Amino acid sequence: MLKVLGIDPGSRFTGYGVVEWGGGKPRYVASGCIRVTGETLAERLRCIYLGVTQVVSMYAPDEAAIEQVFMARNADSALKLGQARGVAILAMAEQGLQVAEYSAKKVKQSVVGKGNAEKWQVQHMMQAMLDLQAKPQADAADALAIAVCHLHTQQSLMRIGSVSSSRRGRMR
């Protein structure tokens, strides 16, 4: 069973979501938010690093995925998001994980069916798709959606690979 960690990086909250592929669909394992504390930038980045490291140690995912940085109207916000993303990627890479990257548009398209979906729609779909009792917090829902998007992508690649292999076998 493939277990994936999704990360939604942020300078105040970093969402995480862990899902695995089981029974032909994504299955919920865990989700939550790392509350980013600290007065200085270095302290906040260290908080993200340690939090992601702890999540990886706790849930032992096979693969990881993170949202790509989008160019916000505020360059300072985009820079801070990029820094948060960087330490999250480092924390996962140091524990041997390959980290896939997906745009917010691709993630929303994968789980909601439209790339310009609202946050509440992502929350609703994660609740429905993963059979959750309640809507997950917005950052955790985004992280779950990133993990589900990665699972969908991996499953599609595996199907394409098996079709290609079977075609090659018939051509011989």
Curated annotation (Swiss-Prot):
Binding of Mg(2+) 1, residues: D8, D139
InterPro entries assigned to the protein according to its UniProt record, in alphabetical order: RNaseH-like_sf, RNaseH_sf, X-over_junc_endoDNase_Mg_BS, X-over_junc_endoDNase_RuvC
GO MF term list: crossover junction DNA endonuclease activity; DNA binding; magnesium ion binding
Cofactor needs: Mg(2+)
Coiled-coil annotated residue ranges, if any: none
Binding note for cofactor: Binds 2 Mg(2+) ion per subunit.
Main localisation: cytoplasm
EC number: 3.1.21.10
Keyword terms of this UniProt record: Cytoplasm, DNA damage, DNA recombination, DNA repair, DNA-binding, Endonuclease, Hydrolase, Magnesium, Metal-binding, Nuclease
Domain of life of the organism encoding this protein: Bacteria
Quaternary assembly: Homodimer which binds Holliday junction (HJ) DNA. The HJ becomes 2-fold symmetrical on binding to RuvC with unstacked arms; it has a different conformation from HJ DNA in complex with RuvA. In the full resolvosome a probable DNA-RuvA(4)-RuvB(12)-RuvC(2) complex forms which resolves the HJ.
Family per record: Belongs to the RuvC family.
Protein name (database record): Crossover junction endodeoxyribonuclease RuvC
Natural source organism: Hahella chejuensis (strain KCTC 2396)
Source organism phylogeny: Bacteria, Pseudomonadati, Pseudomonadota, Gammaproteobacteria, Oceanospirillales
